[in-house]
Amino acid sequence: MLGSMAEPRRTRLTPEERRAQLLALGVAGLADRPLEALSLEDVSAEAGVSRGLMFYYFGSKQGFHREVVRVAGDSMLRATEPLTELPPLERLHDSLTRIVQFVRDHRGTFFSLVRGAASGDKEVREIVEGARGVHSARLARLFHDLGVEDSVLFTIALRSWVAFTEETLVAGALDTDMTIDEIVSFLERSLLAVLTVVDPAAERTLAQ
């Protein structure tokens, strides 16, 4: 079943509200099916609207899928927004904890986002890459706050670690009974190890 996030059937909604409702149902549908199995028929039936209305709002099944991925990615970014009032390393720990918790709570959504990176749809890939870029930028700000200097290798290391983290979350958070603390500790240590290779002078800063 898709989620129960829809308004009651035949409720008159504004176009903006209806579009948001259909996307919410699409994101909820990722809980028990992959993105490619998310059909316009199922979503329109759940919302109590015609299939033609789906085409009116999204143009095609692919257009709907793109917007579902965009909304799902935005929801993850909002849920894991760094708390800038925390000291940098505490901020890292808190953000990673909330990321792992999000993945555990929204397995299908996260898996669809990761799989979207390999999608044949260029726009879906761009949406996923955009979310990765936000995660990398957040990490860069955090380490700049610690005094770690920017460089080409620093940027490459952060983006590579984000991809590494995705695989760790799929394999560790979704496919094992590892605790959240165990996964977070592993990710913290791996990130700090990578950065000290890129910038050996950062080791003393990170150890403080």
Where are these regions (language model features)?
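Short hydrophobic clusters on alpha-helical segments that form packing/core surfaces
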Residues: 18, 22-30, 53, 72, ...
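Short glycine/proline-centered loop/turn elements that form peptide/ligand docking sites
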Residues: 6-10, 28, 37-39, 47, ...
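Amphipathic alpha-helical packing segments from all-alpha helical-bundle domains
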Residues: 77, 122-147, 152-163, 181-196
